[in-house]
Amino acid sequence: MALRARALYDFRSENPGEISLREHEVLSLCSEQDIEGWLEGVNSRGDRGLFPASYVQVIRAPEPGPAGDGGPGAPARYANVPPGGFEPLPVAPPASFKPPPDAFQALLQPQQAPPPSTFQPPGAGFPYGGGALQPSPQQLYGGYQASQGSDDDWDDEWDDSSTVADEPGALGSGAYPDLDGSSSAGVGAAGRYRLSTRSDLSLGSRGGSVPPQHHPSGPKSSATVSRNLNRFSTFVKSGGEAFVLGEASGFVKDGDKLCVVLGPYGPEWQENPYPFQCTIDDPTKQTKFKGMKSYISYKLVPTHTQVPVHRRYKHFDWLYARLAEKFPVISVPHLPEKQATGRFEEDFISKRRKGLIWWMNHMASHPVLAQCDVFQHFLTCPSSTDEKAWKQGKRKAEKDEMVGANFFLTLSTPPAAALDLQEVESKIDGFKCFTKKMDDSALQLNHTANEFARKQVTGFKKEYQKVGQSFRGLSQAFELDQQAFSVGLNQAIAFTGDAYDAIGELFAEQPRQDLDPVMDLLALYQGHLANFPDIIHVQKGKAWPLEQVIWSVLCRLKGATLTAVPLWVSESYSTGEEASRDVDAWVFSLECKLDCSTGSFLLEYLALGNEYSFSKVQRVPLMTVLSF
């Protein structure tokens, strides 16, 4: 029979390639083998794509009856040797099995799954029971390990003949980690759905990892994890999830702290005490290796050092990648577009230089980005004369520990009243609507201005020149009449024709005076607007993980089925700032107790000495009813 599964929860797709599920919906699976917690299948509406494996329960065929029941195995009961021998007979693959799409074939080639056997371990009734071995991410994705690169690699990379910079690669391992951060080949499917290190410790399993307790009798208990199932979401990749789960650790130096102050219009970054500007001049074509490699070099002169440095576009691209990785909640404007052909043409060089000037003006005026070490290294280190210092600064930036989850440790917020989460969420939603509307409006204005500028350069100029040409033709006609009294009239008509030609040229030059700067500024803003959806996703993600942690911990207790989903803690601990700061200690000291009289859980977090701000034992009742 075809592989089928039943949806245990509603799931709304957020990314391309995913499909939405409805609770109790029956789906057709393309393969029972999951890839990093995701299965591929077709829902009841005919949509094919990926969905979380823990959101569904595989519908398995009933086991064949024993030989004594008169089933197919009855004749073998009286034989000395079973017909199939003592080894279990392999079961043929289901008839409706379809190979995964091409995108997954390459991933599955390193290790092919063996055909299913008639033997099933005791936990096989559950989708992830039985502890079937799953291929490790290294095997599944080819085991590619990204290298940090040596000094020779650095020379090869930055001496490429193309001015189009390589796409920034991911640091560290190229394999996708498991949900619990492990990537060993022997970890089973159940082991890859651990709650988290902190939550496991909070339940008393400090000696090692404890897989979730799955209970086939309660389907709801099979799919609750504390982590975001979409491991490719911005909230996960930026380190926001790891931070709110208390997995960020690192020593923050005073120079690395980013201070937020209360300004006249609300919270804002602390201003740069030493503002500066930077000019970009003299784009020149340079060659090396006896002309075999060519590139465009720009001269940068920051006002606070007055020392010129020369940078290629690939250097700008490298800087952008480092800043975007280090500051997940700060919008780093996009660089001017790349171009593979015609990059040495005068018009393209001039246009790119103007775009880099806009980009540099914004970066130098930003209170946080302008003071960043990697940005200052980019502006002040003369790579052509001190190559060793340049490489040291590059390696330091690429090995920066204050990235990802640790970045949030560097934020220093002012002492203020507790934030109302509902008000915070309302403001974020309002800003989200504003950015969406502004993005659409900026795109429309850019299109309209570009079309109008094109008409001025071509259409208007051509039309005025036609009128001027007509007047000059009339003047030439009058010149055929050699009467003395018509000389002044002929000159006036010719002057009118020349005036129309000049007006046409003015129309062609006008966009450079007004519309081109507006469109350049719009391009910068469009880069910001493209960044805001990911930043908003990170901001909104920090508002709910505390509730999700509580929910996940409770679901782990004795396989209990929680029938009431709404959870919230008391107002004293519902502020985003307080939760983000103390969630690590809170989860470590978490104790859950069952109140038999009311059938509800009471959550208790204990004071751990003077290290944390808990002055006494506090009990937070959760509005959750348990059914066993």
From Swiss-Prot:
Membrane-crossing residue ranges in chain numbering: none
Recorded superkingdom: Eukaryota
Signal peptide: none
Residues that coordinate or bind a 1,2-diacyl-sn-glycero-3-phospho-(1D-myo-inositol-4,5-bisphosphate): R312, K314, R352
Biased composition (Acidic residues): 150-160
Principal localisation: membrane
Domain SH3: 1-61
GO CC annotations on file: cytoplasmic side of plasma membrane; cytoplasmic vesicle; extracellular exosome; plasma membrane; recycling endosome membrane
Positions of region (Disordered): 62-188, 200-224
Database matches in PROSITE patterns: PX, SH3
Recorded topology in the membrane: Peripheral membrane protein
Entry annotated with the keyword Hydrolase: no
Domain BAR, chain residue ranges per copy: 421-628
Disulfide pattern: none
Keyword Cell membrane: yes
Annotated Polar residues bias: 135-149
Keywords carried by this UniProt record: Cell cycle, Cell division, Cell membrane, Cytoplasmic vesicle, Endocytosis, Endosome, Lipid-binding, Membrane, Mitosis, Protein transport, SH3 domain, Transport
GO molecular function, one term: phosphatidylinositol binding
Xref: InterPro entries: AH/BAR_dom_sf (IPR027267), PX_dom (IPR001683), PX_dom_sf (IPR036871), SH3-like_dom_sf (IPR036028), SH3_domain (IPR001452), SNX18_PX (IPR035703), SNX18_SH3 (IPR035557), Snx9_fam (IPR014536)
Comment field on protein domains: The PX domain mediates interaction with membranes enriched in phosphatidylinositol 4,5-bisphosphate.
PANTHER family per UniProt: SORTING NEXIN (PTHR45827), SORTING NEXIN-18 (PTHR45827:SF4)
Subunit organization: Heterodimer with SNX9. Interacts with ITCH. Interacts with dynamin-2 (DNM2), SYNJ1 and WASL. Interacts with the AP-1 complex. Interacts with FCHSD1 (via the F-BAR domain).
Protein name according to UniProt: Sorting nexin-18
UniProt source species: Homo sapiens (Human)
